[in-house]
Amino acid sequence: MNLRINKKKFLYLISPNKIYPQFYKDLKKILETGKVGLFQMRLKKYSLTQKIIIGKKIHQICRKNGVKFLVNDDPLLSKKLNADGCHLGQKDMSLKEARKIVGDKIIGITCHNSVKLAKVAIKDKASYIAFGAFFSTKTKKVKFKAKIKILNKVKKLTKTPIVAIGGINFNNYKKLLLNNANLLAISGYVWNNKKYKPLETIE
């Protein structure tokens, strides 16, 4: 699926690692701002049954707010939830195999800091290609650091939407948008912020 980019909806929100009691209310408020284009459910420590229950609730909130709902790592779960697509890392199922499962849905690919990986993803018709981490982050262990110049380099090669990820916050997000990132993936800055409530981080 070709992913249409709405410049007003430049945020790609990723779920917190743990679903807390207030989460669904916070998510609803954030999506109602109209700044989020995609939402990814990324829950590493939950059972399949728990993911299905949580995913159904999230999908409903996303649908009401015109936000695409994606599932991390798991095309089969994405299909089961009738999600809008999935995100795949380099160690997950191949894009071609995932395409057989989810059909003409969104499939995004992690490319770390590699133009070579991006070229493969583009050739395989990924819906978007993701690069990072651009900045330090506590959300997950950083194995790959990306430099901002890769965004401009890849933009010259393709019209495939580009996602920037890793340590993005209020102080650095504009730099990424000005250097050809179409979407900014955020998680820790929203959900683990000790200074601001989730909604306040993106207002």
Locations of regions flagged by a protein language model:
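Catalytic cores of alpha/beta
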Residues: 30, 69-84, 98, 113-126, ...
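Structural preference for beta-strand elements that scaffold enzyme active sites
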Residues: 10-12, 36-40, 66-70, 84-87, ...
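Active-site mouth loops of central-metabolism enzymes
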Residues: 7-25, 106-113, 163-164, 168
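Glycine-rich phosphate-binding active-site loops on the catalytic face of alpha/beta enzymes
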Residues: 13, 88-97, 130-143, 170-203
